[in-house]
Amino acid sequence: LRTTGVSRLRPETDSDGKFVVVQESDVIRPHRVRVGLYKLDDDAGTGSAVVRRIHQVETDIDGERTEIPELAGIEHDLALVNDDDLTYCLMGLTPEHQQFALEHLGDIEDSLARTLVWSSLWESVRDGQLPAREFVRLVARFAPAETHPSVQERLLAQATQAVRQYVAPQWQGEGMDLL
């Protein structure tokens, strides 16, 4: 039986606005997910920018590619393909969404959505798609504002692991100083 491993779900859009959830795994499994689209609101009435969910769709992912017609053409800054954390998977981000997250992670209003983005970014470090130093800097910048102590604790542990195992030895001192 080939049943081990975790599915990776990631969004994909094309120039026509089509929105697809791509499943990457040795074994394709069914998943029930909520896909959430988020946008930066510069005029939130608070004097600072806030990233808010603007649309959400609950759907079944049952193949390598699942088109979500309800999300076609909706302008957004960030898409979470496992919004509300309904299924067990690794959640990927597009390069554009990852860059947005690196700049605005602390502005994401919903704490669960923020935690899901943190998890996705950590997996990107482990996969070699995000430099560990960038993750450490991100933790130093945004983790102190996290509202859940367990999230802060996990982020500090991950950033410490990144410094000890994933960065060049000559940067380890600077990395630990940031934390």
Give the ranges of each region predicted by the language model:
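Non-catalytic accessory/interaction domains
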Residues: 1-179
